[in-house]
Regions:
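Assembly/oligomerization interface modules of large self-assembling protein complexes
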Residues: 14-101
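Protruding loop/beta-arch "assembly-hinge" segments enriched in small, turn-prone residues
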Residues: 2-27, 52, 71, 76, ...
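Short loop/turn segments at secondary-structure transitions that flank enzyme active sites
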Residues: 67-72, 100, 109, 131, ...
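Alpha-helical scaffold segments that mediate packing/assembly in large oligomeric complexes
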Residues: 90-93, 98-184, 319-325
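Extended oligomerization regions of viral-like shell subunits
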Residues: 57, 153-289, 295, 325
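Generic recognition of stable, solvent-exposed alpha-helical segments in well-folded globular domains
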Residues: 28-32, 58, 116, 120-124, ...
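Short conserved micro-motifs at the rims of enzyme active sites and ligand-binding pockets
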Residues: 74-76, 115-116, 203-207, 241-246, ...
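Short helix/loop capping segments that flank catalytic or ligand/cofactor-binding pockets
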Residues: 29, 65, 71-75, 112-113, ...
Length: 325
């Protein structure tokens, strides 16, 4: 139960709140207006960059991962004997955990709004879910105890961390840079995630031939690449630059499975409780409705053995750049 509370957004840190008339005032028009200025809806960077497995049919998903490689031998001449070898698999388990939120709102506010308030709320719920998922997977923020260590902690244990020095190019592209750390584990970097502050550091960064290594798509101007690999700047508030400035790696090794896709349910009866157990809202008595959103998913880093790095304690498909002291 404690495990579930960590990811259950309707277990409020403070007393329960609702969308009141003041909060929805911009949606209740005084004069005619047919547009609502929306901010950019930030989706989960982890789910968009990671590899989705088949949906889970139960709370746990068991995944076989190669743990021992076979060895071949030369046969010495015509009379030499052929030797045997072995191959083994380990099992990694993805455990689905629930993320949820409840949004109460008075019926009078819904009646007086010219716009569909629920249509405006739902994208923000998706953004909140994305922030919660990204924070837990990348940095372990409020992660359930059944989930594995986050990417930054995993990379730290494997020694795949680089402290930013005076030369940013060397810290990223050098022989002991972030990209080299991933390659030393037998993986190729196919993506980067970074704090928004890294954009200013990367502008104008050039390779030894004078060519920029940080580029944007000339057609859209929004898709960025670093050394040819796509780069994300999560803007949902999940990226903790105090722990990492940039995370690079083979994101095909970040896998996730969904037990229950995001579902919405509208309630007209029931109660919403505060943290101390007292009743904050009685939906029927207060003429309110509540939208509940629920999603269940889990993730894992398979990290199978490869020929370049047999020691799994030192093998990691991710590395990160952290700020210098």
């Amino acid at each position: 139960m404690n495990n579930r509370k960590l990811m259950d957004l309707h277990i409020f840190e403070t007393d329960a709140t609702a969308i009141d008339r003041t909060g929805a005032d911009a949606l209740i028009p005084v004069q005619e207006s047919n547009e609502i200025i929306q901010g950019i809806i930030a989706q989960s960077a982890v789910l968009s960059r990671g590899r989705r497995l088949q949906n889970m049919t139960s709370r746990q998903y068991r995944m076989p991962v190669l743990d021992m490689l076979p060895i071949a031998y030369f046969v010495n001449g015509d009379t030499g004997q052929k030797k045997t070898t072995n191959q083994a698999w380990d099992k990694k388990v993805i455990t689905a955990e629930e993320i949820a939120v409840i949004v109460p709102i008075p019926e009078a506010v819904l009646d007086d709004a010219e716009y569909d308030i629920w249509a405006e709320v739902r994208p923000r719920i998706q953004e909140a879910f994305g922030k919660k998922i990204d924070g837990a997977v990348l940095f372990g923020a409020e992660k359930p105890s059944s989930w594995r260590d986050d990417i930054v902690k995993t990379a730290t244990a494997a020694g795949s961390v680089v402290t930013l020095g005076s030369d940013l190019y060397t810290s990223i592209m050098g022989e002991d840079g972030v990209i080299a750390k991933v390659e030393d584990s037998g993986y190729f970097v196919n993506g980067h995630m970074a704090d928004i502050s890294m954009r200013a550091k990367l502008r104008g960064l050039k390779d030894t031939t004078g060519q920029p290594i940080f580029r944007s798509d000339m057609q859209t101007g929004t898709n960025y690449t670093l050394d040819g690999a796509p780069m994300n700047f999560p803007n949902n508030g999940s990226f903790d630059k105090s722990k990492a400035l940039m995370i690079s790696g083979d994101f095909s090794q970040l896998v996730y499975s969904i037990r229950q896709d995001m579902t919405y349910k509208l309630f007209t009866e029931g109660v919403v409780q505060n943290t101390d157990g007292t009743i904050a809202y009685n939906l029927m008595q207060n003429d309110m409705v509540a939208l509940r959103a629920v999603m269940r998913l889990g993730w894992e880093i398979p990290n199978p053995i490869n020929a370049l790095k047999a020691d799994k304690s030192k093998r990691c498909p991710f590395a990160y750049l952290k700020a210098g002291v």
